[in-house]
Amino acid sequence: MMLSCAPFTVTSDPAKSQDAALLAQTSDACARLRQAVGSVIVGQDAVVDHLIVALLTQGHALLVGVPGLAKTLLVSSLSRALDLSFGRVQFTPDLLPADITGTDVLTERDGRRELSFLPGPIFKNLVLADEINRTPPKTQAALLQAMQERAVTVGGATHPLPAPFQVFATRNPIEQEGTYALPEAQLDRFSLEVHVEYPSEEEERKIARRTTSGSSPEVARVLAADELRMLQAFIPRVPVTEQAVELAVRLTRATRPAESSSAEVKNYVRFGSGPRGSQALVLAAKANAAIRGDAAADVEDVLALALPALRHRLVLSYRAEVDGVKDADVVAAVKKLVKV
């Protein structure tokens, strides 16, 4: 769903007037953010839209796509446009938890030796966890704690991460050798799973011209980190219609085999989404409405975000693999079935 600006209504109530101003600011900032990222990234409009939603909701996002589709460039461009500190961790089989979180090191001060904490690369506002499924479960667990608690624990001491703190991870869907399956608990911590597809023929021509011209366009700064935090604090206050909440809950519950009347769910899903799916979907719908400049999130916003908010929370059966049924097929079937 493409994002566009829409009119809003100003009211005499001071609190509502402030929210109306923030709504306009959010819509304008996101339009400028898309333009800034578009100066570097060709196409991928839907991907950019979904990552902006993740940013506004303070959520983590999992980007799935084959190598060479500019996933790293996209995330780093977002960080530059938002003036956020950026960290990249290349996940490998020999990566240790301390390589991510940091470690205590022995230092000498005033003639005395003491342990001091040396922060790892995760102590940034926006962290790219590249090929997250290439590292063992122990290291994945360290990242999970940081994503969940926005803090890391080393040597019995807890160190808070900077605010905002968000993880955008990547996963290569075609290489399985030497990889470790992401546990459901970790997948559930991602607000959205965003699939990055191949560019169109015309977009690929533009990419070929732009990347071989010898020049590298700069990404303009759109927002400062404190301005982003202000917009993030505003998103939960965006109104949402009862129909939208009802649809989000029904869609989530319809992914569970014991409760669903969908043949696709009963035949191909072992476990459906938990309540966190409903929460992520409603919050994403609020962000989507704010980006478009709408005063309240509605059914259309829920439908637009249903696939990225729910697909990674489904555990498909072996039969689904045999029959070639994907998570997107199941979510599409559920969307057709559920009405409000």
PLM region descriptions:
Residues D19-S27, V40, T179, E193-V265, ...:
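Conserved C-terminal "switch" segment of AAA+ ATPases
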Residues H50-V53, T107-L128:
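Conserved alpha-helical scaffold flanking the Walker A/P-loop in AAA+ ATPase domains
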Residues L55-P93:
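Walker A/P-loop
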